Regions:
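Single-residue signature of alpha-solenoid repeat helices
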Residues: 36, 72-73, 109, 113, ...
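N-terminal leader/linker segments that initiate helical-solenoid repeat arrays
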Residues: 12-78, 82, 86-91, 95, ...
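Position-specific recognition of the canonical hydrophobic site in helix A of tetratricopeptide repeat
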Residues: 28, 64, 105, 136, ...
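Structural signature of alpha-solenoid helical repeat junctions
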Residues: 51, 69, 88-92, 128-130, ...
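Residue-level recognition of tetratricopeptide repeat
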Residues: 25, 61, 98, 102, ...
Length: 286
């Protein structure tokens, strides 16, 4: 009798797992707020909380930049967070924190988001890497409303990333910290953060996945009056551009860097070349 019950429970569990996987696949191929999408979410209501929270997590990731979809994703993720067991709640917390960062400038849920982010550390058990990511996402959220809190969060993220072998997250955290210093117009500190990010990038196995930030480094140096160094980084930017769009939207910046060095004729030559490209439909910012 006991063996039969165990067999039935095991069979039921497999069916629930298979149904969850199927619903998740179909959600990823559907459009949020469509009747088909809503129907798939409703079909998860008969699943145990463990599986339903996974379905809601996937549903909450399927939003675009439309505010209506973000609002609906927020509903899915908050419900997933409410019912999720510990080994799913951490993933939901990260996704909801990321979403709040997307909503911050165009939604009315700022206070709700602050309460949520403030409570997560005492409610959720993260791995070290997840915790670092949480503080990074928190800093992204706070950078628009509380610069001091954003600095504290990114510093917590950096302290956690330093204990990990994966440097991709640490690079992104230094870039975010550089952005925060830029808001304060503290360009020496900003460039120091970019330098550290670049040092990590050079030895990272993820260097092909990290979006280059040479333009930001050059802009920071230009604000410090270090035009010659800025020009070197703008040249690195140019190397990344296809030959058909040489200079591209960086023509003005490169020309300003040459002008700052006193090479005014060279700057004029670049701008004249940019104007010719504009006439051919190639360059739009000169």
């Amino acid at each position: 009798m006991g063996i039969t019950i165990l067999f039935l429970l095991s069979s039921c569990r497999k069916n629930e797992k298979a149904k969850t996987a199927e619903l998740c696949r179909e959600l990823e191929n559907s459009v949020m707020l469509s009747p088909a999408f809503d129907s798939l979410v409703k079909m998860s209501m008969g699943l145990p909380n463990f599986f339903r929270s996974k379905v809601l997590l996937v549903a909450g990731r399927c939003y675009s930049t439309k505010v209506e979809q973000m609002q609906q994703a927020r509903i899915y993720l908050r419900e997933a967070y409410r019912i999720a067991p510990r080994d799913v709640k951490n993933l939901v917390a990260l996704e909801l924190t990321r979403l709040y960062g997307s909503l911050i400038l165009r939604d009315s849920c700022v206070e709700e988001a602050i309460r949520f982010i403030s409570r997560v550390p005492s409610k959720v058990v993260f791995t070290r890497e997840e915790e670092a990511k949480f503080y990074y996402l928190g800093a992204c959220f706070f950078k628009s409303i509380d610069i001091d809190r954003a600095f504290r969060a990114v510093d917590q993220a950096l302290s956690l990333y330093r204990g990990l072998s994966d440097t991709e997250g640490e690079i992104e955290a230094y870039r975010l910290k550089a952005t925060l210093y830029g808001v304060l117009q503290e360009y020496e500190e900003q460039y120091a953060c970019y330098e550290e990010a670049y040092r990590l990038l050079r030895r990272s196995r993820f260097r092909d996945k990290v979006k280059p930030f040479y333009e930001q480094m050059a802009a920071s140096l230009k604000k410090l009056g270090r035009h010659e160094e800025a020009l070197l980084w703008y040249e690195e930017v140019l190397k990344e551009l296809p030959d058909s769009s040489r200079l591209g939207r960086y023509g003005i910046q490169v020309a300003e860097a040459y002008s700052g060095l006193g090479y005014h004729e060279k700057a004029r030559e670049i701008l004249r070349g940019g104007l010719m490209n504009e006439k051919r439909g190639g360059m739009r910012n000169v």
